[in-house]
């Protein structure tokens, strides 16, 4: 029995901030963002768009009504939780109308969470082969106005349906994970934005890659020639590019180096227009590679490097199956270009707006007409979501 990703899709917010505009407003050389980070645009989520609505939109974009009745597990991987007790997956389960006899829960370990969710989903299908699991990597990266992390914000969700005999890719049994108890990036419960030791986090990302990859090579007796492409966690694409260069073997043929670079460039296309989506960033890169490459084929092995601050990293691989391209979307870039561009002033107002609750802990929200799903009100401190009628 093979297990893997049967369907994969993506959703993001309706608003976009051009980093050229942000750079000019902040008095920054635009090339520090376009070349120094390899970023162009950021998706900006309003108050009515959160990880629940993004996850519902992404999930709905790939699921049929029949599949909603077959799913028996919903996992939301996130570090942008909306409630300290109730899992975002429970909200999403209800919004999508998934059959009631299902497990729904949330997984957290910074940007690594979705990788953990995939492995849990795989184990579930191994034990229950008829099962289907919906994994939703949903996050909003919000650092604050005029902070060092401001150009690496973003919002979005990658949805993946896990099943036996998948139509996109199979998981190979070759993963190596590593844990380090460090403080490179963290967000205490009392803070709405994270604390970041940027230089240290970069060092840890790269060193975790090096050591995890070296252990992977030892365990599975392989090298980069065994892979058609490598996808990386993408807090910003330039860091992943440094990672690629760090593990490129000098003895690797130039033709192979060029191929890995070509596929890397294809893997960052969506992230360059969306920004950082934490748990979803690695898998947005994978989706970008699949939908923008003209040379991938069935049987190709793709390596993936997952990193979550704190820190947990993992190196593993997948293999494309025959007909995988039939499950993909060919107009995603056009859809991203349809987002509404914001001025920097509007971005500051929209992205950092907070609900104005009355004495009972209630607020009625508006302005969500362009969304598929929305947070429409808060009643007695309870978040109320709805599908938006068009």
Q: Where in the sequence are the language-model features?
A:
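Flexible, glycine-rich active-site loops centered on histidine and acidic residues
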Residues: 126-159
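A conserved active-site cap/scaffold subdomain adjacent to cofactor or substrate pockets
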Residues: 199-220, 225-248, 270-275
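Short, well-ordered amphipathic alpha-helical segments that serve as non-catalytic structural scaffolds
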Residues: 29, 51-66, 88, 204-220, ...
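Condensing-enzyme catalytic core mediating Claisen C-C bond formation in acyl metabolism
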Residues: 1-48, 147-203, 207, 316-390
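Conserved beta-ketoacyl condensing-enzyme motif
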Residues: 5, 51-112, 221-247
């Amino acid at each position: 029995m093979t297990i893997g990703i049967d369907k994969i899709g993506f959703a993001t917010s309706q608003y976009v901030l051009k980093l050229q505009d942000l750079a000019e407003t902040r008095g920054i050389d635009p090339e520090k963002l376009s070349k120094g980070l390899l970023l162009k645009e950021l998706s900006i989520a309003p108050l009515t768009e959160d990880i629940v609505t993004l996850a519902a939109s992404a999930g709905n974009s790939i699921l049929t009504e029949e599949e909603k009745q077959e799913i028996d597990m919903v996992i939301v991987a996130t570090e942008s939780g909306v409630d300290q007790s109730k899992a975002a997956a429970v909200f999403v389960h209800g919004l999508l109308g998934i059959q009631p006899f299902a497990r729904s829960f949330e997984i957290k370990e910074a940007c690594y969470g979705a990788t953990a969710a995939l492995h849990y989903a795989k184990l579930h299908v191994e034990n229950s082969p008829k099962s289907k699991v919906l994994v939703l990597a949903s996050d909003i990266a919000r650092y604050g106005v005029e902070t060092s992390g401001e150009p690496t914000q973003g919002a979005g969700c990658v949805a993946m349906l896990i099943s036996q005999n998948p139509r996109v890719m199979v998981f190979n049994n070759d993963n190596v994970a590593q844990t380090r108890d460090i403080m490179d990036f963290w967000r205490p419960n009392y803070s709405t934005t994270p604390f970041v030791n940027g230089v240290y986090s970069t060092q840890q990302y790269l060193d975790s890659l090096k050591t995890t990859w070296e252990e992977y090579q030892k365990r599975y007796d392989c090298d980069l020639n065994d892979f058609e492409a490598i996808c990386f966690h993408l807090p910003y694409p330039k860091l992943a590019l440094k990672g690629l260069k760090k593990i490129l073997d000098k003895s690797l043929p130039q033709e192979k180096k060029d191929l890995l670079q070509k596929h890397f460039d294809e893997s960052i296309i969506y992230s360059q227009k969306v920004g950082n989506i934490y748990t979803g960033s690695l898998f947005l890169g994978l989706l970008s590679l699949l939908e923008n490459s003209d040379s991938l084929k069935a049987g190709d092995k793709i390596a993936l490097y997952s990193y979550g601050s704190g820190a947990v990293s993992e190196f593993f691989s997948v293999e494309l199956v025959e007909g995988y391209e039939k499950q993909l979307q060919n107009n995603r870039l056009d859809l991203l270009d349809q987002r509404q561009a914001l001025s920097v002033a509007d971005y500051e107002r929209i992205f950092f707006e907070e609900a104005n609750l009355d004495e009972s802990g209630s607020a009625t929200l508006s302005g969500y007409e362009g969304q598929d799903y929305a947070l429409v009100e808060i009643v007695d401190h309870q978040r109320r979501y709805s599908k938006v009628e068009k």
